[in-house]
Amino acid sequence: MSPRSTLRSPLPSRTARSSASSDTPSPGADRQDRMSKAKELFVLCDKEGKGFITKRDMQRLQQELPLSPEQLESVFESLDRDRNGYLTPLEFHTGLGELVGSGPEEKVRSAGEIVGEEREEPTEIRFTQILMELGADKLFKDQWELCGLWCELQRDKPELLGVLEEVLSYTVSHLQDALKEKDNLEHALRRREEDHDRVVRSMYEDMESQLKEERERRQALDSMRQGDKKEQLLHELRTREQELEFTLTKQRELESRINSLSSDQADARGENRRLQNVNQQLQDQLEQSREELQNSLSQLQQLQNTIKLQQRGKEREVLKVSRNMQKERESLVRQLELLRDMNKRLRDDKDAHQAQKMVSQKHSFTPPTYYPACRCVHNFSPWPRSIYPY
């Protein structure tokens, strides 16, 4: 028997169920068997546990079924009625049941039974339509349990299908509200991120402005200091020049007096001793003046050397100030890089928090309203299994 024939589990119509003999399998057993086989195939395709399968996942059945990749691709396209590129569990189960078709025992049924079965809407298709009407066909990751519960209620307790629809509607409403709240939170986070970027940009502009103002202030201060020192040195230089000029004038006057006394020496031999004493005094004064002149020249030389040293110190100071400004600029650039790194880490933390929050919200929903237990005289419970989808 081929794997395709092992997957054939038809949905009996009302006519077939009413005319079936006691030795044939019950419709519930056939449906459960078909659902279990479809689920096994779906799990074989969805090895990552995504909750849906793609065309590439469908091609993994090549090792399980005697079908070529082209045939598997054709099967996937026939099942993908929405043309969205993937199949949910219910779409796979319902489409696979229709694609596999009836077994050999159903081929001999009468034409009237076949027409009656075609008119009947399969339970799984009806369940899929209800999920699509509620907008929940893409909300639930695993829909096998819900489909099984729906089929059992359809078979055993059709009057409870309305209750299950209300529970599904209530659950879908809360899930949609949660998704809207998540969208609002994401919008708020994006707005906060934009505000943060704007604040960082403003801080960067303020730092640039402060750096420019500090640079201009230091340049103005250095110019003022250089101007004041230059004026002071020029004033001292003019003072020393005046003193030197006065000393030279005094020296010339003394020399003139010496010449005058020398010319009068012949006429005043009697006053020779006195003139010699005066001459000696004048010579002493001349020597003192020369010493003062020498001292003045030495002081002038020292002033010139001091001016040169100060000029070199100014150059070194200007170089030092420029180096300090370069170091300060590098420090500000490093601070800016730190701010950018902090901003990147904040974005990464926000993305991780959003991903964790999306995962936690995907596996949580508001529990449905509990209904009282059935008080009828039946021996079995109206709630054969949990109605939760997970």
Swiss-Prot record:
Gene Ontology MF: a single term: calcium ion binding
Annotated stretches, region: Disordered: 1-37, 206-234
Bilayer-spanning residue ranges: none
InterPro entries named among the record's database cross-references: Ca-binding_regulatory, EF-hand-dom_pair, EF_Hand_1_Ca_BS, EF_hand_dom
Coiled coil: 173-357
Keyword Kinase: no
PANTHER family: CALCIUM-BINDING PROTEIN 8, CALCIUM-BINDING PROTEIN 8-RELATED
Family in the record: Belongs to the EFCAB4 family.
The protein's name in its UniProt record: EF-hand calcium-binding domain-containing protein 4A
Species whose genome carries this gene: Danio rerio
